[in-house]
């Protein structure tokens, strides 16, 4: 999808800017400035939605300046997060977003077990007979699930895991009425636009 106004008055641009991390220390980052068209506001944060061509949206939420990112995350839940996105306002937003990369690795066996996936991790109860059997008669079961995620955000778009998404170009000449610059810790997510499900979510507390 490409949305182009009758006159191009604002282009994406990149400039050096300060970013203040979770401890208040500052570093110089490459800040990407752009104009977006969906403004998010909830009790303790503001943010924006940046659309991508492939049916995904980049979502950013910036907690209030006097609120620690850890406190903000601790009070988040899926219901309020999705409600905030669903209630986005069609408002022009002047945004600033730093280039960043993040990579995490997490063991998921315990998480999946708590979610109810018990038998698969039990060497006696697991049933993977449709996949095959051990020649010595031992049962197949899952001993470890390792989840690795990687995201890179720059002026060319966002690359998450093995999938690359490209921003939708949105241009217009209406007066901007909101301003959201991600110059301190923030929460970000990539959302499947069709069903509203987050496919990637994280927090940038230091760059």
PLM features: what roles do these ranges have?
Residues 6-7, 11-207:
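Hydrophobic-core positions in well-structured secondary-structure elements of globular domains
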């Amino acid at each position: 999808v490409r949305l182009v106004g009758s006159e191009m008055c604002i282009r994406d641009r990149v400039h050096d800017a300060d970013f203040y991390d979770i401890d208040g220390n500052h570093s110089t980052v490459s800040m990407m400035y752009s104009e977006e068209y969906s403004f998010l506001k909830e009790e303790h944060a503001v943010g924006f939605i940046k659309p991508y061509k492939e049916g995904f949206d980049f979502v950013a939420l910036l907690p209030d300046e006097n609120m620690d990112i850890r406190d903000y995350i601790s009070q988040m839940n899926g219901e309020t997060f999705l409600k905030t996105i669903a209630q986005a306002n069609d408002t022009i937003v002047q945004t600033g977003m730093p280039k960043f990369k993040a990579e995490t690795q997490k063991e998921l066996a315990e998480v999946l077990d708590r979610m109810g996936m018990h038998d698969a991790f039990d060497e006696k109860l697991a049933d993977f007979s449709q996949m095959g059997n051990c020649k010595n008669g031992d049962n197949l079961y899952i001993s470890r699930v390792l989840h690795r995620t990687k995201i890179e955000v720059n002026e060319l778009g966002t690359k998450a895991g093995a999938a690359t998404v490209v921003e939708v170009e949105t241009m217009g000449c209406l007066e901007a009425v909101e301003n959201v610059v991600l110059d301190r810790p923030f929460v970000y997510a990539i959302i499947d636009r069709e069903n509203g499900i987050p496919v990637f979510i994280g927090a940038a507390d230091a760059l």
